[in-house]
Amino acid sequence: MGFLLIKPWSREMMANIWSSVKLNRLHIEATIIGIAFVLEGIYHFIDQDFFEAIVPTWFRYATFANLASGGAEIVLGLMLIIPKFRRIGAWGLLLLLVAVYPANIDMFINDVDVQTNALGVVERVVDAEGVRLRNFIRLPFQFLFVWLVWRHTRKQPINFSGS
């Protein structure tokens, strides 16, 4: 008869289940974000001309900026996927997002577009038609990425079992 006094869904049990769901959701989110950064980083090496054209003209080392940021995206994206290195990877990605933000501002201010000319050469086009709105929309999206990554800088238990 005593077993009837045990609540099958106690608050503690529900809290453990919810904690597990929340941790699993954050793990899945970090994995998706990490994979996105890894793929974007790889793309820096595949389409170097495109990414070098995005680098503001006042920064003289476009090739270095492209390869360094692409390499950082790969390494930090992988770190975000691995729970043991997630916080460090997230902090690194935050710094990277802040470092590349001036390129987004430059693209908006100067109406920059990256186009392929008739000879098949990728080039940076300043005062391009019809890009202002697109370049403006990129600016707040960077803050969304910062927020998504920032969520993984906080100390979290790595116990995904819910126990």
Q: What residues fall within each predicted segment?
A:
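Membrane-interface extramembranous regions
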Residues: G2-S163
